[in-house]
Amino acid sequence: MQSRRKFIKNTGILSAGLMAIQSQVFASEASVFNFPVKDFISKRPPLAERKFTSKAVEAAIVRIKKQIANPELAWLFENCFPNTLDTTVDFEIIDGKPDTYVITGDIDAMWLRDSTAQIWPYLPFVKEDAKLGELVKGVINRQTKCILLDPYANAFYKDFDKVSEWKNDLTKMKPGIHERKWEIDSL
């Protein structure tokens, strides 16, 4: 399992890579990236099975892939960049407000810090895609609900009635809380 620190570090590396791509570092003239062309088939879920789609993100994938000379790197970008939207978000409207629960790893729980890190790469696209903007508002709304439930917890369940396996920890565990280990970077 990947640590949160490594996840955030890798997200930063991906963001730097995106900026490098846009600055022509990976221009097609770069002979170091000229490999034999292979068929790289998308590993993304079929469109009907994706949790969320964004027209702006999809357009960016097409645009950026064209700028990446190495077909394998282009394929990796196409599969990795939209992964949070494709597989980990649960977006709905609750009481007239957007609500977005983001699974942050292999555990069905939402960490405040990690859910922020997962949607961070999509922030530049919210002006182009109102639906994506609603998804981001939903994350903020969900995080607010979580903090109001317990400002000292760091990971929460979608269902605020669910009881954690850590319910007997020597802390004030409540239903809806997966883990109560306050982290300063959750703020």
Give residue ranges: language-model regions.
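A short N-terminal beta->alpha junction/helix N-cap motif
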Residues: 44-52, 64-72, 106-110, 124-131
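N-terminal secretory signal peptides and thylakoid transit peptides that target proteins
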Residues: 1-15
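Residue-level signal for alpha-helical transmembrane segments in multi-pass membrane proteins
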Residues: 15, 19-22, 123
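Internal amphipathic alpha-helical repeat/solenoid segments
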Residues: 82-111, 132, 156-157, 178-179
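Basic/polar, acidic-poor N-terminal "presequence/leader" segments
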Residues: 33-48, 97-113
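Amphipathic alpha-helical dimerization/protein-protein interaction segment
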Residues: 55-93, 142-146, 155
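Aromatic-rich carbohydrate-recognition surfaces in CAZymes
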Residues: 108-136, 140-187
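C-terminal segment of N-terminal export signals and the immediately downstream linker at the start
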Residues: 22-61
